[in-house]
From Swiss-Prot:
It catalyses: [amino-group carrier protein]-C-terminal-N-(1-carboxy-5-oxopentan-1-yl)-L-glutamine + phosphate + NADP(+) = [amino-group carrier protein]-C-terminal-N-(1-carboxy-5-phosphooxy-5-oxopentan-1-yl)-L-glutamine + NADPH + H(+); [amino-group carrier protein]-C-terminal-gamma-(L-glutamyl-5-semialdehyde)-L-glutamate + phosphate + NADP(+) = [amino-group carrier protein]-C-terminal-gamma-(5-phospho-L-glutamyl)-L-glutamate + NADPH + H(+). It comes from Thermococcus kodakarensis (strain ATCC BAA-918 / JCM 12380 / KOD1). Belongs to the NAGSA dehydrogenase family. Type 1 subfamily. LysY sub-subfamily. PROSITE patterns: ARGC (PS01224). GO terms for cellular component: cytoplasm. Its EC number is 1.2.1.103, 1.2.1.106. The active site is at residue 142. Its main location: cytoplasm. Keywords: Amino-acid biosynthesis, Arginine biosynthesis, Cytoplasm, Lysine biosynthesis, NADP, Oxidoreductase. NADP(+) binds at residues 10-13, 34-36, 297. This is Putative [LysW]-L-2-aminoadipate/[LysW]-L-glutamate phosphate reductase. The gene is lysY. SUPFAM superfamilies: Glyceraldehyde-3-phosphate dehydrogenase-like, C-terminal domain, NAD(P)-binding Rossmann-fold domains. InterPro entries: AGPR_AS, AGPR_type-1, LysY, NAD(P)-bd_dom_sf, NAGSA_dehydrogenase, Semialdehyde_DH_NAD-bd. Pathway: Amino-acid biosynthesis; L-lysine biosynthesis via AAA pathway; L-lysine from L-alpha-aminoadipate (Thermus route): step 3/5; Amino-acid biosynthesis; L-arginine biosynthesis.
């Protein structure tokens, strides 16, 4: 059994990670940590996990083969020395995703730049071989995951793209602020980052395409939809052929139906799963390609992708513990 510890397990990503690991046939959870909730049973913070015999601790010492750092951005680089060398590490924050120049542009000065190159960017569809050999993995951001998966097959067709993102309330995490209370959050379609979103750096790094994000908060609890536009004067057949690079990927589903309930990707149909649904449209009159990508931000955009990476790092089938379909209806 793989012994797993989750550092910072009180947030939404941490809670979903604990849920997935608890159901994983090859994993034993040895520790979940939280400074705020140390000593409390896990279901006091994550009520859906009632019956799971775990308590939060505030220790830095535990028996683990893999440690998940589910902590806020900027924290991992401060605590990484507590865990380096003791176990494989999967970092859920943004601290080690970007090369130093891009990190500086989007986040500021990095406190541990010498460690950046030791981390593998944890998007299995692009870096499966490197992840299998890795000791340190940086889990991608949710918006970056959806956008990179959609844009990567077309990276040779364009050097810039417009990315319109509709994201759920859980993408903002569990932080308490007035904008997140129900009277303020309900029924919104709120632009909260019109340009220079931090996840742009991940897209530039992984695809070479200059992606300009505009991000909207919408009135859903989980899930996100990326709609990507770029100039394209080729054929519809060429667009489809490019997407077929994913035909054997276990967690990418191509949505190309011409009729029925779902003609294009919709986050409603991936909730609770590790799937990314990708589709496209071709606006020939205006010489535009429109590529769409839907994921559950907490699973493929977070905890599920982390488990997928763990599976690869330990030589397991990457579908282990993740091979289930989305919840429906939601």
């Amino acid at each position: 059994m793989i012994k797993a510890a989750v550092v910072g397990a009180s947030g939404y990503i941490g809670g979903e990670l604990v849920r997935l690991l608890a159901m994983h046939p090859e994993v034993e959870i040895t520790a979940i940590t939280s400074r705020r909730f140390a000593g409390q049973k896990v279901h006091k913070v994550h009520p859906n996990l009632r019956g799971l015999d775990l308590r939060f601790t505030n220790t830095k010492e535990f028996d683990a083969d893999v440690i998940f750092l589910a902590v806020p951005h900027g924290t991992s680089m401060e605590i990484i020395d507590d865990y380096l060398g003791s176990a494989k590490i999967i970092d859920m924050s943004a601290d080690f995703r970007l090369r130093e120049d891009l990190y500086r542009e989007y986040y500021g000065e990095h406190k541990r730049p010498e460690l950046i190159e030791e981390f593998v960017y944890g998007l299995p569809e692009l870096h499966r071989k490197e992840i299998r050999k890795a000791e340190l993995v940086a889990n991608p951001g949710c918006n970056a995951t959806a956008t990179i998966l959609a844009l990567y097959p077309f990276r040779e067709l364009t050097d810039e793209a417009i990315v319109d993102l509709k994201v759920s309330s859980s993408a903002g995490g569990r932080r308490e602020n007035v904008a997140s209370i129900h009277p303020e959050r309900s029924h919104v379609v709120r632009v909260y980052k019109p340009y220079h979103h931090r996840h742009e750096g991940e897209v530039i790094q992984e695809t070479g395409v200059k992606a300009a994000f505009t991000v909207h908060s919408v009135d859903i609890i989980r899930g996100l939809l990326a709609t990507i536009y770029f100039r394209f004067e080729g054929s519809t057949r060429e667009l489809l052929r490019k997407l077929l690079v994913y035909k054997d990927e276990p967690f990418v589903r191509l949505v190309t139906d011409k009729g029925g309930l779902q003609r294009f990707p919709d986050p409603k149909y991936v909730i609770g799963s590790n799937f990314a649904d990708i589709g496209f449209a071709h606006d020939e009159e205006n010489s535009r390609a429109i590529v769409l990508s839907a994921i559950d931000n907490l699973i493929k955009g977070g905890s599920g992708q982390a488990v997928q990476n763990m599976n690869l790092m330990f030589g397991l089938d990457e579908r282990t513990g993740l091979n289930y379909y989305p919840v429906y209806p939601v």
